[in-house]
Amino acid sequence: MALNDFHVSEPYTLGIELEMQVINPPSYDLSQDSSTLIDAVKSRLTAGEIKHDITESMLEMATGVCRDIDQAAAQLSAMQHVILQAASEHHLGICGGGTHPFQKWQRQEVCDNERYQRTLENFGYLIQQATVFGQHVHVGCANGDDAIYLLHGLSHFVPHFIALSAASPYMQGSDTRFACARLNIFSAFPDNGPMPWVSNWQEFAGLFRRLSYTTMIDSIKDLHWDIRPSPAFGTVEVRVMDTPLTLDHAINMAGLIQATAHWLLTERPFKPQEQDYLLYKFNRFQACRYGLEGVLTDAYTGDRRRLADDTLRLLDNVTPSARKLGADSAIDALRLQVKKGGNEAQYMREFIADGGSLIGLVQKHCEIWAGQ
């Protein structure tokens, strides 16, 4: 199968996708009513898109192409208002978080959609288990070769993005001991983790052609890599973040990725090499397991450093780019988060340690998303 040409887009433009939990009070389990909710909101939207994602307990909010985080925030805020209004009318709740803390995957209904039904046929129960919730950020690129360079550059910071956004410590009623348990769900997929090594767009087109021989890949959307190029949009898509509990944090994460992309493409601080990925999965695991307390290991020198410290260094490096893009508020907020030493997974555990229940935790998450 031939790959589409890379669509030229304005560099550093943004698109944000948020996979939201549709909740059924008073049990605060996942609902199976996303279709009802989506039908109720479609006519009310003025910008962006609201659509299905895998199962009937998931709802995806997606912005259009945005020039900066302020425009993205305005679109997401408008969608949030419409969704919350419709959810209230249908006695449903909406919240973020990378996993629902006590839902049972066996109860999840895959959407009546040709693509998702085909995916269910290919992957079986793994698709129902993939009822987890992430934030994806698209960044515009001028051409395919820039997209491949950007993908490799951003891959250096996958642990940082995971640790900052980690919000999935609980699954199936248990504390997983992970800050981000969501990404473990995809470990059984044949395309889990980093994209196979290529050095330019021509090589990527050849890779995609060979992957299509498996009969499991019909489009880029069928690839579950941590970061992937999206030629139809002319973007690189970062896919490792848990959906945050607040819109503000989602915007901050998008601002960081946009600023990092600008820094990478203007400064070119790395010469991508295949060996860069030698310890990729080990460092990724550290971020998932321990969050900002994880330890990164340099694939070349063996040097080890705290993820929190390296994240502060990243934030310092991208600050000039953030100022140019109007994303400096995002960098400031994330710097404060790192210095305080926490993420949303830590907040969730503190809620339970203070005597809260998992049902109460989901209720609290719905209240947080609704701004209560």
Swiss-Prot record:
Enzyme Commission number(s): 6.3.2.2
Provide this UniProt record's keywords sorted from A to Z: ATP-binding, Ligase, Nucleotide-binding
Q: Name one GO molecular function term.
A: ATP binding
- As given in the record, the signal peptide range reads none
Which Pfam family is one of those matched by this entry?
Answer: GCS2
The first-level EC class reads: ligase
> What InterPro entries does the entry give?
GCL_type2/YbdK_subfam, GCS2, Gln_synth/guanido_kin_cat_dom, YbdK
Q: Which domain of life is it from?
A: Bacteria
The record's catalysed reaction(s) read:
L-cysteine + L-glutamate + ATP = gamma-L-glutamyl-L-cysteine + ADP + phosphate + H(+)
What's any GO biological process attached to this entry?
A: modified amino acid biosynthetic process
User: Record's Gene3D superfamilies?
Assistant: 3.30.590.20
Q: How does it assemble?
A: Homodimer.
**Function noted in UniProt:** ATP-dependent carboxylate-amine ligase which exhibits weak glutamate--cysteine ligase activity.
- UniProt similarity note: Belongs to the glutamate--cysteine ligase type 2 family. YbdK subfamily.
Q: What is this protein called?
A: Putative glutamate--cysteine ligase 2
Q: What species is this protein from?
A: Salmonella choleraesuis (strain SC-B67)
